[in-house]
């Protein structure tokens, strides 16, 4: 292009030399000026259009994660600002190109997502149809209650709803329908069952930055459990999970002499956002069950069986010991139903104080009538004339007898503790490893029984020797 312009300039200059007239000279000069002006404007335009361009295309930038549309939009705004046209209009062209631009990975991802949605919808539909099927013989009667078989929409919905709700009852109900085994036969059976909580009644746990977690045992807890164990089947029902409360329960009764069974939060019924200790799950007659707890939610299903107590904060008190006379009276009177007696107290939280007040009145009446030869109180308590001419109040006689039995029982427990300690020392070395199991070196059940009997004889012999040594030491 430049060479053409140069040649044209040279030709014009030659023409000017050939024609010497002034008019022709002026015309040629004007033509040269116009030609130079157009040439300079062409050079300026070429300089503007000849800006440096990147070797990275829009596709390469898009794959790398660069937002090409924003960049292009910025350029469009700049161009529109310069030209003064289409300043506020969106770049529909760039949006369309963005929608169309998809990599192979995006196509695969969209394909898999569609298949996942189809599979999920099919699975949910199939599950719903399966759960709405007719009842099967092995399903529980409680689940099938008031819902018949059939494939009408209403019946299918009811069966689906019943089966769907039953899946959540697994987490709301206790692990077993009967939390306790059947009671022993009458000669060995305690007349009443006493369910007591652990936290803030027998023990109190608190945390401090200096000492961490510490657990305090309430004054009189050992006496409370030991004394009432001769009258009641004691069930320790903790409000905490087993992993936290099991060790504390073992410390309270290491040889299981006082507490018959331990239950924990896992055995509660979860209802309305709270854990409830449902006494109907204990496999016991509710007319013979008493629960002592500090949380009203724990006994909200059977409040008539409850003795509410204030939570213990760790300070020394005698409320456990003061509760014993009433519980002893209740167990020794051959009560058919404990609920009317419990509900006869206006304020159950102060039951011990109110019972002491009643006993005091009855005792004054008894001694007043005894002076005049009356014996109505003994008859009212079911003792008749079995106490002969004793002037002691019947409840005092019952307490004295219970105290004697308690001392004898505790003496036997101390001996049993020593025997259990010796047994644990002797049985500690009797273990079998995984290697013995793999190699088949385990003894047969008959051989294991013989080994245990021999060990038990050794334990009994060592225990008798320990008793003889103690007697000799005491005699000296």
Curated annotation (Swiss-Prot):
SUPFAM superfamilies reported for this sequence: HAD-like (SSF56784)
Start and end residues of each stretch annotated as Disordered: 67-105
Any matching Pfam family: NIF
GO BP terms, alphabetized: intracellular protein transport; protein import into mitochondrial matrix; protein insertion into mitochondrial inner membrane; regulation of mitochondrial membrane permeability
Superkingdom field: Eukaryota
Keywords, comma-separated and alphabetical: Membrane, Mitochondrion, Mitochondrion inner membrane, Protein transport, Transit peptide, Translocation, Transmembrane, Transmembrane helix, Transport
GO molecular function list: identical protein binding; mitochondrion targeting sequence binding
Domain spans labelled FCP1 homology: 187-330
An annotated GO cellular component: mitochondrial inner membrane
Mitochondrial matrix side: 44-114
Transit peptide: 1-43
Membrane topology reported for the UniProt record: Single-pass membrane protein
UniProt-annotated location(s): Mitochondrion inner membrane
Regions crossing the membrane: 115-131
Compositionally biased intervals (Basic and acidic residues): 67-95
Family per similarity comment: Belongs to the TIM50 family.
Protein function: Essential component of the TIM23 complex, a complex that mediates the translocation of transit peptide-containing proteins across the mitochondrial inner membrane. Required to direct preproteins in transit and direct them to the channel protein TIM23, and possibly facilitates transfer of the translocating proteins from the TOM complex to the TIM23 complex. Does not act as a structural subunit of the TIM23 complex but plays a dynamic role in protein import. Has no phosphatase activity.
Note: Present with 2400 molecules/cell in log phase SD medium.
Domain commentary: The mitochondrial intermembrane region is required for generation but not stabilization of the TIM23 complex. The FCP1 homology domain does not contain the canonical D-x-D-x-[TV] active site, suggesting that it probably does not display phosphatase activity.
Name of the protein this chain belongs to: Mitochondrial import inner membrane translocase subunit TIM50
Species, as recorded: Saccharomyces cerevisiae (strain ATCC 204508 / S288c)
Gene: TIM50
